């Protein structure tokens, strides 16, 4: 019988979890993932720790999602990703649970807009739509730049930020 997401414990990622999560990302994504444009926006920037979540089953990491602060047109934006589910848990709804939880928590701590780079048919079920006029660093396909929240009148390049330029609710954990 298949597992259900109810059997999974959802917690906030801690600094001690960093390498375990990195190993999951390495397992789930192609080699060279760090060369992607989103990684350039994350370099040297603390993640939004309240939105970096882990899903564990019996203490074993089954899924993870991270969120990073960026800016578009001078406004704070939460950049979602990576999100990964261990191959033995794919198809159980765990990725969707992580995304819905991040959207809910982000709203409650004051993030007005979230974005990600991903597959529109998949992320559209959570309310994400294509962000016309929002430009990720190349080589990002503009059809994969998606957002949710208050994007009215906001366009421009997605820029890397330092922790001091993020909303007050941001409390990034230290990676050292």
List each model region and its residues.
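Short amphipathic alpha-helix that is part of the acyltransferase structural core
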Residues: 1-39, 47-61, 152-176
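Conserved beta-strand in the GNAT
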Residues: 52-54, 60-70, 76-84
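Conserved acidic functional residues
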Residues: 13, 118-119
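Short, solvent-exposed loop/turn elements at beta->coil junctions and helix N-caps
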Residues: 38-44, 134-136
């Amino acid at each position: 019988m298949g597992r259900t997401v109810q059997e999974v414990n959802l917690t906030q990622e801690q600094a001690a979890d960093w390498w375990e999560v990195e190993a999951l990302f390495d397992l789930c994504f192609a080699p060279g993932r760090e060369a992607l444009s989103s990684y350039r926006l994350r370099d040297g920037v603390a993640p939004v720790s309240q939105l970096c979540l882990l899903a564990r089953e019996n203490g074993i990491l089954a899924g993870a999602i991270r969120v990073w602060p960026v800016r578009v047109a001078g406004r704070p934006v939460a950049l979602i990703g990576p999100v990964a589910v261990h191959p033995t848990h794919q198809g159980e709804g765990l990725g969707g649970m992580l995304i819905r939880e991040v959207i809910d928590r982000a709203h409650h701590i004051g993030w007005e807009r979230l974005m990600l780079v991903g597959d529109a048919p998949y992320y559209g079920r959570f309310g994400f739509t294509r962000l016309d006029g929002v430009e990720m660093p190349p080589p990002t396909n503009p059809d994969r730049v998606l957002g949710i929240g208050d994007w009215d009148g906001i366009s421009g390049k997605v820029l890397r930020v330092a922790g001091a330029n993020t909303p007050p609710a941001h409390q990034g954990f230290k990676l050292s």
